[in-house]
Amino acid sequence: MEVVRGSSLVLLVLLLGALLVSQVESKSCCPNTTGRNIYNACRLTGAPRPTCAKLSGCKIISGSTCPSDYPKFYCTLGCESSQCATNSNGDAEAVRCKTACSDLCQDVDDA
């Protein structure tokens, strides 16, 4: 009984390790929030990554950095989510914050 439990535990650890490695190996980069939402909804149906990427306009990469044609979006999105999300001073303030992020990230495309 103890041998069965031990081998089951080893098998479980190996399967979890394989799952984590496959999660780390590939990443999707999407050009906008709509594309990300389409990709995520597609993946929830169980469709393969390449199919969902093609449908949504996203790219599957093996590294950790998105392609050079995506940086402005990620700069703006990161700025807005970290700086503007906690803004509780109304819509006008939120618009000013988002505009500032857009201006800050404007030169990223030229880099």
Curated annotation (Swiss-Prot):
Positions of the propeptide segment? 73-111
Q: Where is the signal peptide?
A: 1-26
PROSITE patterns, per database record: THIONIN
Matches recorded under InterPro entries? Thionin, Thionin-like_sf
Q: Does the keyword Plastid apply?
A: no
Where is this gene product found?
Secreted
Disulfide topology: C29-C66, C30-C58, C42-C52
Give the protein's biological function. Thionins are small plant proteins which are toxic to animal cells. They seem to exert their toxic effect at the level of the cell membrane. Their precise function is not known.
Protein name listed in UniProt: Viscotoxin-A3
Recorded source organism is Viscum album
